[in-house]
């Protein structure tokens, strides 16, 4: 099985999710450090659609920049625009497999798509 993780190595939950993926037999992991290689708008919308999420659901609301930019009460298009300009606003880790996409918070959620 192939799995892709949009990963931030500075995030403990992201590191723990990656460890679960790497320790699971038969899983071939692709790691994308999304702060260095952000997803495109279309890619992020596709991931959210597969996960049953909206951009608001994928907003890293506790990131100070979210409040500074007035995103806590913004519409999805505004949130998505901000995510494209500032990828730190994308909540992580997102994991995609053949079985679906999950925002893996807590990290054990990744097991639902393995």
Describe the residue ranges of each PLM region.
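Thiol/selenol-based redox catalytic cores and closely related redox-interacting motifs
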Residues: 34-114
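Local sequence-structure signature of Cys/Sec-based thiol-disulfide redox active-site neighborhoods
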Residues: 1-24, 28-34
């Amino acid at each position: 099985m192939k799995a892709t993780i949009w990963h931030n190595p500075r995030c403990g939950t992201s590191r723990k999710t990656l460890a679960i993926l790497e320790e699971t037999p038969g899983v071939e992991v692709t790691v994308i450090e999304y702060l260095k290689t952000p997803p495109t708008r279309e890619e992020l919308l596709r991931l959210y659609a597969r996960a049953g999420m909206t951009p608001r659901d994928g907003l890293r609301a506790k990131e100070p920049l979210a409040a500074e930019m007035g995103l806590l009460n913004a519409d999805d298009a505004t949130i998505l625009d901000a995510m494209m300009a500032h990828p730190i606003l994308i909540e992580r880790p997102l994991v995609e497999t053949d079985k679906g996409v999950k925002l893996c918070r807590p990290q054990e959620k990744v097991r639902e798509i393995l």
